[in-house]
Amino acid sequence: MIPSYDPNDTEAGLKLLEDLTTNAEAIQQQVLHQILSQNSGTQYLRAFLDGEADKNQQSFKNKVPVVNYDDVKPFIQRIADGESSDIVSAQPITELLTSSGTSAGKPKLMPSTAEELERKTFFYSMLVPIMNKYVDGLDEGKGMYLLFIKPEIKTPSGLMARPVLTSYYKSQHFRNRPFNKYNVYTSPDQTILCQDSKQSMYCQLLCGLVQRSHVLRVGAVFASAFLRAVKFLEDHYKELCADIRTGTVTSWITDSSCRDSVLSILNGPNQELADEIESECAEKSWEGILRRIWPKAKYVEVIVTGSMAQYIPTLEFYSGGLPLVSTMYASSECYFGINLNPLCDPADVSYTLLPNMAYFEFLPVDDKSHEEIHFATHSNTDDDDDALKEDLIVNLVNVEVGQYYEIVITTFTGLYRYRVGDILKVTGFHNKAPQFRFVQRRNVVLSIDTDKTSEEDLLNAVTQAKLNHLQHPSSLLLTEYTSYADTSSIPGHYVLFWELKPRHSNDPPKLDDKTMEDCCSEVEDCLDYVYRRCRNRDKSIGPLEIRVVSLGTFDSLMDFCVSQGSSLNQYKTPRCVKSGGALEILDSRVIGRFFSKRVPQWEPLGLDS
């Protein structure tokens, strides 16, 4: 089920894409047949299929329940603790992928196999012919793609647990990839695989600057990471230019493989190049800086869908009119689809699901609230509601244009009818394969980078801060709160709006700086593993801020929401605001601003059950 072709042959790649999307229904049936043939004897599926490789789609749906992570966590944890892979997979589980989502504050673990890396390599290869279809001459230069690895964790079984991109970059599929004239990087692999993210960033930018005349596209995986690179360049351009001018690498780059690989690219002093770059970077405005430094660049490749859409205005400011290209939709659980119209407006990005990547089903959701249509999952059944309404679950080729769905996957690696949590809207079809716009991650209210903070996570953290710091000795009541992700600066940070009042009067609250700063720190301490990693290790999120607003502010917010069409009877304070008008009301009534003064603790540990 893993096709192959010469990635240097654009026409062959486009033909393969046509074949896959034209035969989507048959391929989906083959995928399910293969998964069940391989894995029907696993402990997990035996409980539902009695060891029979029942390959009929409807029978599979009748017998195997739709599940979420809490349902499958015990099975995956047993593998992490050293039990056999055949709990969920006939193929050996070779690693566990850490999701950006968390369960009980710890990263979710997704099983993966050696074969799955081959499937991902195929997926990446399909991106190249699509770009070649729309952009000429990509074989005449290089891409400055800023790619990074993150910490790994060794589980009791000996299996490594790591983010999906770290898994791919460290694999032989990436490190020993065959030459592809359309996909040559400015960054040596040694700089991508550097454990120190700051050294990695510096070295990759230095290589991209030295090779500026060869750079035809720039980018990173996520918009947030690319903007951190722009900010890093702004902070370090003088040092970078000094290295180019002298043909040396600054002394604080201590990773020897990084130093050696970068020195080979520097290849001696270049006064003229250093002066050109420094002149551009010294300009008062950095508007259009990407086009000015890399004048041959044809586009910026970053994911700008979902929570990354908040970075589009900033990217447009720096890009100088370069198209923003969002090529793919993938997660730790599965690689899903690709953008067949990569030069479209970022707001119009849709992904075409590749039918050979997994078996896909879709749970309809309400198009207004994005709440699930009434049904029961395996872990949440009532006596009167314990039967899954099978007619609501839709196959890949049977989704309807304009409808919203949550994607449900059955993978080759041991996830069966698993709810990913992504809400998608069907925008059309390419041949028989549907195209989806990513709408949102279910239950997520705040996200800056790879963090995903839910309303429940936020409530628990705010409650803890309130109990530990507001009741004594300050005697303040937190009457209401909301939040938003502030990306006006780099890195972005969480902002909480709190309305406080004294317990024993209606006077304006007296705000003690240390108390409020402790509240900021307490909230951060209570947020999950991924948030704390982003703050502590990755430095991709700035210190959390609390803005205290005057009494009555949330009444004004309610009035505004009702004036915009919300029902007064059903109004609930939004726990995250995105409307410009709502933010204006909140910001206009701020009476105090406080930031966390310390970085929350984070250790790459704690995956035990």
From Swiss-Prot:
Gene that encodes it: GH3.17
Identification of the protein by name: Indole-3-acetic acid-amido synthetase GH3.17
Keyword Transcription regulation: no
Record-linked PANTHER family: GH3 DOMAIN-CONTAINING PROTEIN, INDOLE-3-ACETIC ACID-AMIDO SYNTHETASE GH3.17
GO biological process, one term: response to auxin
Function field: Catalyzes the synthesis of indole-3-acetic acid (IAA)-amino acid conjugates, providing a mechanism for the plant to cope with the presence of excess auxin. Strongly reactive with Glu, Gln, Trp, Asp, Ala, Leu, Phe, Gly, Tyr, Met, Ile and Val. Appears to favor Glu over Asp while the other GH3 favor Asp over Glu. Little or no product formation with His, Ser, Thr, Arg, Lys, or Cys. Also active on pyruvic and butyric acid analogs of IAA, PAA and the synthetic auxin naphthaleneacetic acid (NAA).
EC number in record: 6.3.2.-
Keyword Protein transport: no
Native source species: Arabidopsis thaliana (Mouse-ear cress)
Induction text: Not induced by auxin.
Residues annotated as transmembrane: none
GO molecular function: indole-3-acetic acid amido synthetase activity
This protein's UniProt keywords: Ligase
Classification via Pfam families: GH3, GH3_C, GH3_M
